């Protein structure tokens, strides 16, 4: 299973202003299309289309435990080597679940390739994470902390949260983004560094920028 397209509730102009190459309503990062559907389309990362789903998963836009998913038969787009901001690829998609085992079962049932479950808390307090390999990209599903589940009134379906991109020259990319990017720090993954886009960037979802895998 591989990612064809992500649909994000942002205006194309917002991404272009941050140094992404945008044509019409589409931005191709690596081999993934990002369709910028506008602020009126929803909130954040609305959904995705996947190639190679098992069975009838995604045939009619059915959710995978809350993650809006459609089946794609599209060929790979022509890859974009690098955007003006220096970003070259999508590293991973982040989703959050109140019940990690339930979400993992739904994703595996659709044919997604579970690589591992990390049974250690993250610095942000998430107790567990599951990682799925989707071609060159990763889906990271994060178990919501108990206090977050309590705040939202108990169990809820999984939802998309954010994106992480690869910037080989992270210092140059952060300099290009100026006040819209955070300071660079060590990532949780050993040997990698990370920065994030600030709210001033004006995007509809959290975005991280990372150095490539060492």
Residue ranges and their predicted role:
Residues 87-90, 157-159:
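A short, structure-level motif marking secondary-structure boundaries and short turns
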Residues 103-106, 140-154, 163-168, 175-176:
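A structural feature that tracks compact, well-ordered secondary-structure segments
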Residues 112, 131, 149, 156, ...:
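General N-terminal targeting signals
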